Amino acid sequence: MAEKYNPQETEKKWQDKWAADRLYHAGEDSPKPKWYSLTMFPYTSGNLHIGHWYAEVPADCFARYKRLNGFNVMRPVGFDSFGLPAENAAIKHHIHPRIWTLNNVENMRRQLKTIGAMFDWDREVITCLPEYYKWTQWFFLKLYEAGLAYRAKAPVNWCPSCQAVLANEQVVDGTCWRCETPTTRRDLEQWFFRITNYADELKDHDGLDWPEKITAMQRNWVGKSYGAEVSFALDCPAAPEQEIKVFTTRPDTIYGVTFMVLAPEHPLVEKITTPENKAAVDEYIKKSRACTEIERLSTEREKDGVFTGAYVTNRVNGHKVPVWIGDYVLQSYGTGAVMGVPAHDERDFVFAQKYDLPVITVIAPPDYDGQPLEAAYINEGVMQNSGPFNGLPNTEGKEKVCDYLAEHGWGKKTVNYKLRDWLISRQRYWGAPIPMIYCEKCGIVPVPEKDLPVLLPEDVEFRSGGESPLKYNEGFVNTTCPVCGGKAKRETDTMDTFMCSSWYFLRYTSPGYDKGPFDPEKLRYWMPVDLYTGGAEHAVMHLFYSRFFTKALRDMGIIDFGEPFKKLFNQGIIVSNHQKMSKSKGNVVTPDNLVAEVGTDAVRAYLMFVGPWDQGGEWNDSGLSGMSRWLNRVWNLFTEEYTPQTASAEAERELKRTLHQTIKKITMDIERLRFNTVVAALMELSNSLAKFKEAAAVSAESWQNSLKTFALMLAPVAPHIAEELWANLDMEYSIHNQSWPKWDEELAKDEVITLIIQVNGKLRERLEMPAGISEDEAKETALNSTRVKPHLQGKTPASVIYVPGKLVNIVVK
């Protein structure tokens, strides 16, 4: 056995052997229960950073633990490889996105292997390869067949200087990322998925073990609101429409409406605007189109608008109210029109003050004296100035007003959602082509399944304008209609990259299957994912889209389950000097350098020790060095010869108790994903074992068994050194095929406990007592303590409270 531990040599040796033996390949013929462990796959940016390791390592530790506990564990790996960065690299470095991406895959694959994770590399998927995106296109066709994919006009970002469409990612602070010209908005035909059809299901997380912050974010993203749709009479000869509809969550305030605001994009704006107001309205619309939705909805931005010159009539009281346009109203939410009730809405109150619009109080605050309000009153109260509803509590009035509106045909109860359909069109090259064809005779025609995949052409010219090169590639664009055989053109938009990541977890179950996107039997065996780990930033994108996708496939009969991920865990982030790591700050930690310096296992153990996994922690080079030294001490603990001296029954009992207590603690902590305390417990155990070794009072057999137990618990944390130590104990290969140690509750019990004695909640004594002490004995001992008696002042205690094995609290009045 080597005298000094060489981590790099040992780690490479075992990584090579594990790979050659396909140790971590998981099949479907195992009698063991399955466990599907998955971490969100990385984007092919080129290099793994320490954040990738922090996502992977604790998840790998848990997967290894499950394997040792008798589970058939699948832990696949792959690469999210379509997207805008590859296209930007093509322009910047004059290299094809495919070459840039696959070079990055090769490098990142090498880096991932150094983690020493139990990845099943037989299951690797790369989303930019035709054998993968063929099925992405197939899913698009299935969604189209089901009526869930449709084409409609939608606003896009436009750079007037480049004369090009820009992706949202290419707009920086409202300007073009290349020329810094202020961007505007234009309407273009785009492809959407009807994710809104699943709004109610997507806000329901029953049966899922997910963080509350994620489920709350998804519920808020869906934004379900109960209210009423109300119609206001429109008297405008230029508009054939006779009314404008609004959605409101406050029908109880309908009598307080003093203005209406339409979104600048509302189809009625052009029709109802009077000639004298047209110039101002047109200028305002032009200005609003230069703003992103985020800017328009910002709570910090002052709300403004322009009067159209038109009026509508509030049918409940006959009041004529002016119609304005304002960019804080979005056409895509509700009806694209809102009623202004300044007395009871903070935003409306500010708007009314700015433009000197009336404020009518219709919900009276407590002790209201009839004076004008100094701010919007948004709480509950009694209805006033509300016709037949005067004197009603407004909570009751909501229901009655809705009934009144429905009775007169002026409105109805309805439910509204903030959620909008998923726009999947991208005007770029490096994505899965949308498999649709446009024929002058037949219209929009889907590509036949037998003709999939629609391949990305290799001979493309990358332009800096922001438009897809596919648009100018005649060999790609020009095709024949599959229905009539006439001349036709292909769709030149590609799909949002989130489309690829919305089903990759399904492909992992049978990545080589070529008769469909997955083998139904293997899918049935593995899905759903038992533990999914990754960043919380994906709450309302990837995680949301994956759930929609799964539910849609279920409804199409393609799969038989509706949720992809049983348990979700979001890791925190590793920071340096209390700052998030970034290249610009020069504080990025490169794992390759760390592995070369101290080895993989030291990096793994330190990452798990640095802080609670869900919170992250502060990177510290000295902490990593300390972890390396600890592993060397563990190595010495195993390799330095043990020679028992005098046998001691007490030492044997204490060793067993120490081992069984540690097994219990580590098992419970791993189950709770508390890896920092797992590593701390291993450190404490190694220190205890060192003392037992020095005392040499336990038998050689007991010592050997303690080392085996320690190695097994070390294996998920530091798999390479654990494998080496196991081999050096002459144990059967591999340690990762063994069984996790079990604790005996009796052996784990302390013989002596520390009993806290309090009087009226104040600490008065600590007593070392036998672990099996009864309640009566504990109370009697506490009452007779010489340190406690003076605080009782000769009085009989009102009560004596006993917390078993921990505390006695004496209450004296």
Swiss-Prot record:
Keyword Transferase belongs to the record: no
Reactions catalysed: tRNA(Leu) + L-leucine + ATP = L-leucyl-tRNA(Leu) + AMP + diphosphate
Key words of the record: Aminoacyl-tRNA synthetase, ATP-binding, Cytoplasm, Ligase, Nucleotide-binding, Protein biosynthesis
Gene Ontology MF terms: aminoacyl-tRNA deacylase activity; ATP binding; leucine-tRNA ligase activity
Positions of ATP binding: 583
GO biological process, one term: leucyl-tRNA aminoacylation
Bilayer-spanning residue ranges: none
Sequence motif 'KMSKS' region, location on chain: 580-584
Subcellular localization: Cytoplasm
Pfam families according to UniProt: Anticodon_1, tRNA-synt_1, tRNA-synt_1_2
Enzyme Commission code: 6.1.1.4
Motif extent ('HIGH' region): 42-52
GO cellular component, one term: cytosol
UniProt key word Membrane: no
CDD domains assigned to the protein according to its UniProt record, in alphabetical order: Anticodon_Ia_Leu_BEm, LeuRS_core
UniProt xrefs under InterPro entries: aa-tRNA-synth_Ia, Leu-tRNA-ligase, Leu_tRNA-synth_edit, M/V/L/I-tRNA-synth_anticd-bd, Rossmann-like_a/b/a_fold, tRNAsynth_Ia_anticodon-bd, Val/Leu/Ile-tRNA-synth_edit
Alphabetized HAMAP family for the sequence: Leu_tRNA_synth_B (MF_00049_B)
NCBIfam families assigned: leuS_bact
Homology family: Belongs to the class-I aminoacyl-tRNA synthetase family.
The protein's name in its UniProt record: Leucine--tRNA ligase
